[in-house]
């Protein structure tokens, strides 16, 4: 997969497996009705209720829920004063009827059957963007509104996918549950509130990087950060989620399951691969890949006493500025051939050498220790609270060897 300001395609099939903590989704969904009123205001919620009764396609999406209750439509003035919504209008596409919601940074087109679910999207997306811009290193605002389509059924999503991707649609139509991003636009469908929002956060990172970064990140970092951005908690009664990168039960469960089943790959294989190359092996291999790059970004941020965080921050800063190539050319740890290969590579260990550690073997051992500690932790309580499941060593003092 390639992150580019030019039209490109990236996608993320999402796990169908139910984690040991699947009841998290039911708790999160209880806040969605109130979220609609706080996020969009009473007028928009009423408009959405009108859309919810339409006939839909014969896809695999969830059945249309009952309209939002009166209490969920009674927005408080204080909440409405901070609404991220700038405009709303009806939206139709080839017989699909829905609503378009514009915020300061997003254009969201929805044919979701649930008014409250649609109502939750503006606040969620604006909070997600703030997380992209602050979760790892300060990053700039996108140069334009980011566009998202969230369909109410898989059938609607499939028809739009064929329209959007043409002859390239086949692999996406064949995946289980998921979404994709093409040319900065994310295309999703309803697979339940919690999972849909997790995919929205993942694909939203791809939208942000495609439109904002001048240099592409390596695949392992692009996908790893997208997974890192998935974790969130929805406080009951709050219009906005709290993003917590460790609160990702699917990735943590998959990491542990892959280890038990002997499916974890060596770090070099992860860095040299891609979601497509792992999917060519099996869907399980691909899900293991996503879990490993999720853990890898946590390692880069916090592992080995925070040793690698400055390099991670430099790489992101250079991607924004478009200066990754300059950094490669200035790297003394690579010879001329290595610099040529690094400049043209979308994956591999080259940027580890440039930004993180010239001694890859030592770097890999540190990563293995970090993942080993995660696997031994069985820290479900901490994961559910959005906390690191292991006790991390304190960062080394500034200037220490």
Positions of PLM-derived features:
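Short linear motifs in low-complexity or flexible loops
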Residues: 6-7, 74
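Bacterial signal peptide processing site
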Residues: 52-55
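Post-signal peptide N-terminal segment of mature Sec-exported envelope proteins
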Residues: 58-92
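Juxtacatalytic substrate-recognition/specificity segment
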Residues: 80-81, 93-218, 235, 324
